[in-house]
Curated annotation (Swiss-Prot):
Transmembrane segments: none
Stretches assigned to coiled coil: none
MF (Gene Ontology): mRNA binding; structural constituent of ribosome
Organism of this sequence: Pectobacterium atrosepticum (strain SCRI 1043 / ATCC BAA-672) (Erwinia carotovora subsp. atroseptica)
Record's protein name: Large ribosomal subunit protein bL12
């Protein structure tokens, strides 16, 4: 008479925690395996990182050509002259929040061409 999987599961369910630990140790020794390796492999696929879809464009420093940076900020944000100047002078400052990757890269490129130091977060 052979033992079924259900009977084994019932027997393990009836065991105390210490008995289960001893059973696992005995199985590791008998079959030459490690229960920890199986757990690590099972946990691997759960760590899927989501790709970021919204980015913040941060003006880190204005560089040598302040006027060109102010013009680039005005054209990119639609701010008035005073608001754009205040934003540039308050660097490091967040210029735009929650923009797409393409928009963030485009904005970064135009500001860097004007001489600013820009970071996309």
């Amino acid at each position: 008479m052979s033992i079924t999987k259900d009977q084994i599961l019932e027997a393990v369910a009836a065991m105390s925690v210490m008995d289960v630990v001893e059973l696992i140790s005995a199985m590791e020794e008998k079959f030459g395996v490690s229960a920890a390796a199986a757990v690590a492999v099972a946990a691997g696929p759960a760590e899927v990182a989501e790709e970021k879809t919204e980015f913040d464009v941060v003006l880190k420093a204005i560089g040598a050509n302040k006027v060109a940076v102010i013009k680039a900020v005005r054209s990119a944000t639609g701010l008035g002259l005073k608001e754009a100047k205040d934003l540039v002078e308050s660097a490091p400052a967040v210029m735009k929040e929650g923009v797409s990757k393409d928009d963030a890269e485009s904005l970064k490129k135009s500001l860097e061409e004007a001489g600013a130091e820009v970071e996309v977060k």
